[in-house]
Amino acid sequence: MTYTYNDGGRAESGRKGQTGDCVARAVAIASGRPYSEVYERLAKGNATQRKSPGYKTHRGNRGKNTASHGIATTRKWFKDYMTQLGFVWTPTMTIGSGCTIHVRADELPSGNLVLMLSGHCAAMINGVLNDTY
């Protein structure tokens, strides 16, 4: 598999340092939208999502106007946003099936993909993994 270092426009938007914004980077890369636009939309979604008791978000991000510490990708607002961008959710695993699809160009469809991985999110463009690590 081919890999390309791509921060999705994060540095160009003026942000510095390390952070947990892999969802914003992956969506910006795969959608072709500016990082700052995607980041702001995800931050707004985080800030306005319902604060359910016991619902965990990455690093306690719930209710904060930020996308730099993870996004609750299972929330309806996130799924609606991805649909608005033209993405279609395609599950590759079912409960009890084990891992049958891997991050390999020959096992995934071509085109612009946002890969929801275990604890991480990355973009794949026509078989080329675009990420920062």
Region spans (language model):
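Active-site nucleophile-adjacent alpha helix/oxyanion-hole segment immediately C-terminal to the catalytic cysteine
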Residues: 1-60, 68, 76, 80, ...
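Conserved active-site-adjacent core of cysteine acyl-enzyme catalytic domains
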Residues: 49-119, 125-128, 132-133
